[in-house]
Amino acid sequence: MRIPFPVEPATFLERPNRFVIHARLHASGAQVRAHCPDPGRLRELLIAGATVYVNKADNPDRRTPYTLRFIEHPANGQLISLNTQLPNDLFAEGLTDGFFAPFVGYTKYKREVVLPHSAPIHPNQNQSKSVAIVPNHTNLRPSPALSKGVSSRIDFRLSTEDGAVCWVETKSATLVHDDGRAYFPDAPTLRGRRHVEELEYLALSGARAALVFIIQRPDAISIAPNRETDPDFADALGRARARGVELYAYTCGVTTSRVWLEREVPVMLNNANHKDTKTRRKNN
């Protein structure tokens, strides 16, 4: 995927809050404020003196005139994308290009589909296939968000020519330890846990559901839930996997002008001695 805007190098100075960094542009020496799109802690990356890449905002009146897009790893120079909006675009591009073996045959998709809390998952003959509905299942433990009547959005609703449906959430990951293992999340994420619970709810109701981690760097060999940072998310992911949610992860190649899907790596849960839990679609 081509990056549709030019970026310029700068030196990272500080991060006064989750959404703002201060940096010094290499070309002019000017100190600038930049929006940080990744709300993770990024402690191993945002170290004073690190080289970052920013682009100028289109709106000259914005409080942060620049946006942080990439960073060079302070230890090894590895370029890492910090654009948390990019994984959905990469997933859509991968679907179109036939990159994902688990989703071959899903030729159509809708993005950001609202999942009402009170409707069934599979459309009947009187309902539009673009509307998500949830079944009345007496043995089903509903997602806390859905049970409270909160409408939620699922990143993708995939469908085949014969009407088979798969629900997909993507998650952006950037944290990779020295051993090559990536971890998610980098900060506690109630929203991320809710998404996992909703996928679990869909899977228990009989729908196909998958969580796809997009690791925005090429050096990861696997990914695991970050139990130290968010044990609740780790527990939710384990429950979801046990109840039928499929887990996949893919690394990315990264330059300042292009980011692309590169290869699949295993998703490893933190129990069972890090047993490989990479899943494939079940045969019906």
Where are these predicted regions, by residue range?
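Domain-level recognition of nuclease-like catalytic cores that cleave nucleotide substrates
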Residues: 216-271, 284
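Short aromatic-glycine-enriched beta-strand elements
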Residues: 17-22
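Nucleic-acid nuclease catalytic cores
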Residues: 171, 180-193, 197-229, 251
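Conserved catalytic cores of phosphodiester-cleaving nucleases, focusing on short active-site segments
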Residues: 10, 154-186, 199
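Short, low-complexity, charge-dense intrinsically disordered segments
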Residues: 120-149, 272-284
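Short nucleic-acid-contacting surface segments enriched for D/E, G, S/T with interspersed K/R
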Residues: 40-53
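A short acidic/basic microdomain associated with nuclease active sites
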Residues: 99-119, 139-142, 146-148
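Terminal, basic amphipathic appendages of nucleotide-handling enzymes
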Residues: 46, 55-97, 101
